[in-house]
């Protein structure tokens, strides 16, 4: 079918566009319509009145668009003016009632979002959130403006002519309102933004680093609990008034022994960095309340932590800033700053001497590893070698080696001493002021002749065969264990227990003992002695089995035994009668009305007893010790230098 010439459609519409069918010369064998002239020229005169411009629809659309935009701009200006006026009288906390859809301040209409259809929507309440110069957000209720949308032209000319001007005018209105209602550079706004931040501590740490050029954590160590007490504290206080900051430097002195105060002006006000040593220990809560009262700053604007006491970098910072003109320092410099900054202290702390630690443990009679570790660590403030010990990564090894060496030295020292020297050595460790009479009175109270007891004690201390064991028996609560244990405590004797008799090593403590004791021997225990330990009771050499060591041949030390039965009178153990020296305690131990012992038996009284009966017990000095009255046994020393102390 041949193509028809002309246009399709009626050509109506507001856009002014129409379609023109091109006239194409005949190139095929198709038949041409008879009512058309193939040779006629198309001049377009028949289309001159095709579009009617009298309605002027485009001009009307542009005029309506301008009126709508003007109305929107005026409504926005009025709303902004109302918010600026009401912000002074509206609660900054806002209303908690539910609202409609929130409209952002940057949400503006453009020509591209406008359609020709006009539709009215139900008026709803909207909330405009306006920043309030750091004092919180103001929420102002207003009626939502009737939505009017206008369709855009397909060529986008309206957007180019009017859309840009609308956005520029709206943005200019917003900037003017912001400049009037909020100054982001003001100190008040900055400190309020700090308080409103989600992570206040991170914000304060960031501002501190920007101000001082170093991290706050480089100067402090962290206390997880707010109740932990400490005398030294580092405080960073934000937003302090300049006048209060100057007066604070004087007011704080009466609460502290040492203060180091730095104050710098920032956008948030004065930022104070302070190192303070209080007169007594305080926790974080107490320190915060005190500083808040003096500076009129909330505790949430403070960073409070104790200083690093072992960091040379932190100590050097306080030392260098303390001698500069940016700090106000009062009081004596803390010892931990002096220790970490003085050159000599630094040299001494860097070298650890194990022999010094061993000498300290030997002099103070520490042989347990836990006691050595704890007590030596307590000396770190006044002993450079102890401070170096704490800095070492081999503390456990040093403690173990120190305890081992101290035990070796103690064991060798004890073996080289005779019984007279050992008693003299133990007397030198006790204080004066004892009385020997309570011991004698207690023996008489139990019906024991003092002279017979002295004779038995003399043979007992010498380790005479068949006289090497003393047995004290009697009813319960007669003071047997109290009397014997006090003597063991004074002479540092060793206590063995029959409960461990199933082990081959239960007698191993006898290897290092000058004196031994077995408390509360029963019939089973006496049977064991009768079967296996007759030579030990005689005071002859015995063989001891030691754990992880070879058998040791040694003379059994003097043995003191308490019991509720008399082994001499029992027919089951006839062979023990000649090996035991027996004393009976028949009377109950006396107490006064306050439940205190009537006869006081302690180290002081035993010292006085041995000094009084020294000659009676035949505790004479050795010939190689000299003719003087004092026993000059030189104190052991394992470090260089002179030691003038005597034993």
From Swiss-Prot:
Q: Which PROSITE patterns match?
A: SF3_HELICASE_1
Q: What is its main location?
A: host cell
Recorded hits in SUPFAM superfamilies, A to Z, give: Origin of replication-binding domain, RBD-like, P-loop containing nucleoside triphosphate hydrolases
Q: What is this protein called?
A: Replication protein E1
Bias (Basic and acidic residues) ranges: 159-170
Regarding how it is modified after translation, the entry says: Phosphorylated.
Location comes to: Host nucleus
Phosphoserine modification, residue list: 92
Oligomeric form and interacting partners:
Can form hexamers. Interacts with E2 protein; this interaction increases E1 DNA binding specificity. Interacts with host DNA polymerase subunit POLA2. Interacts with host single stranded DNA-binding protein RPA1. Interacts with host TOP1; this interaction stimulates the enzymatic activity of TOP1.
């Amino acid at each position: 079918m041949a193509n028809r010439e002309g246009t399709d459609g009626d050509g109506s519409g507001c856009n002014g566009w129409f379609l023109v069918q091109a006239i194409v010369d005949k190139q095929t064998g198709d038949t041409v319509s008879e009512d058309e002239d193939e040779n006629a020229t198309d001049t377009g005169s028949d289309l001159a009145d095709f579009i009617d411009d009298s309605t002027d629809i485009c001009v009307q659309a542009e005029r309506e668009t301008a009126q709508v935009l003007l109305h929107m701009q005026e409504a926005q200006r009025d709303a902004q003016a109302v918010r600026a006026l009401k912000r002074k009288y509206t609660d900054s906390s806002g209303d908690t009632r539910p609202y409609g859809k929130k409209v952002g301040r940057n949400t503006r209409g453009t020509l591209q979002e406008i359609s020709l259809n006009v539709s009215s929507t139900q008026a709803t309440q909207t909330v405009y959130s306006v920043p309030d110069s750091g004092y919180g957000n103001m929420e102002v209720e207003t009626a939502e403006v009737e939505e009017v949308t206008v369709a855009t032209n397909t060529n986008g000319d309206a957007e180019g002519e009017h859309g840009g001007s609308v956005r520029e005018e709206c943005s200019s209105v917003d900037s003017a309102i912001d400049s009037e209602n909020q100054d982001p550079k003001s100190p008040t706004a900055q400190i309020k933004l700090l308080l409103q931040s989600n992570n206040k501590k991170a914000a304060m740490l960031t501002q501190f680093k920007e101000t001082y050029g170093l991290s706050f954590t480089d100067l402090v160590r962290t206390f997880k609990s707010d109740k932990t007490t400490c005398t030294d504290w580092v405080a960073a206080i934000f937003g302090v008034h300049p006048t209060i900051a100057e007066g604070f430097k004087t007011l704080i002195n009466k609460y502290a022994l040492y203060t180091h105060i730095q104050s710098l002006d920032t956008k948030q006000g004065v930022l104070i960095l302070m190192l303070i040593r209080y007169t007594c220990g305080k926790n974080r809560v107490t320190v915060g309340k005190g500083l808040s009262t003096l500076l009129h700053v909330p505790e949430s604007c403070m960073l409070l932590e104790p200083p690093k006491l072992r960091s040379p970098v932190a100590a050097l910072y306080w030392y260098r800033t303390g001698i500069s003109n940016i700090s106000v320092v009062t009081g004596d410099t803390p010892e931990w700053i002096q220790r970490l900054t003085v050159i000599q202290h630094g040299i001494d702390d860097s070298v650890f001497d194990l022999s010094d630690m061993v000498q300290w443990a030997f002099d103070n009679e520490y042989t347990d590893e836990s006691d050595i570790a704890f007590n030596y660590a307590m000396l770190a403030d006044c002993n450079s070698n102890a401070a170096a010990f704490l800095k070492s990564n081999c503390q456990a090894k040093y403690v173990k080696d120190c305890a081992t060496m101290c035990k070796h030295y103690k064991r060798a020292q004890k073996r080289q001493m005779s019984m007279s020297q050992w008693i003299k050595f133990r007397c030198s460790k006790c204080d004066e002021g004892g009385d020997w009479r309570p011991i004698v009175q207690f023996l008489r109270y139990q019906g024991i002749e003092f002279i017979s007891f002295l004779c038995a004690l003399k043979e007992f201390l010498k380790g005479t065969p068949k006289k090497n064991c003393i047995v004290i028996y009697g009813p319960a609560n007669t003071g047997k264990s109290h009397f014997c244990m006090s003597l063991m405590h004074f002479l540092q004797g060793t206590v063995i227990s029959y409960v461990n008799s199933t082990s081959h090593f239960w007698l191993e403590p006898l290897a290092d003992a000058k004196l031994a004791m077995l408390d509360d021997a029963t019939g089973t225990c006496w049977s064991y002695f009768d079967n296996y330990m007759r030579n030990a009771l005689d005071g002859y050499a015995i063989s001891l089995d030691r754990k992880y060591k070879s058998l040791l041949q040694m003379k059994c030390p003097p043995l003191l035994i308490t019991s509720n039965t008399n082994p001499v009178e029992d027919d089951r153990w006839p062979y023990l009668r000649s090996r035991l020296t027996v004393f009976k305690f028949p009377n109950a131990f006396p107490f006064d009305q306050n439940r205190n012992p009537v006869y006081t038996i302690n180290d002081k009284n035993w010292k006085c007893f041995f000094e009084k009966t020294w000659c009676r017990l035949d505790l004479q000095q050795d010939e190689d010790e000299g003719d003087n009255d004092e026993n000059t046994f030189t104190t052991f020393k394992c470090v260089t230098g002179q030691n003038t102390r005597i034993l």
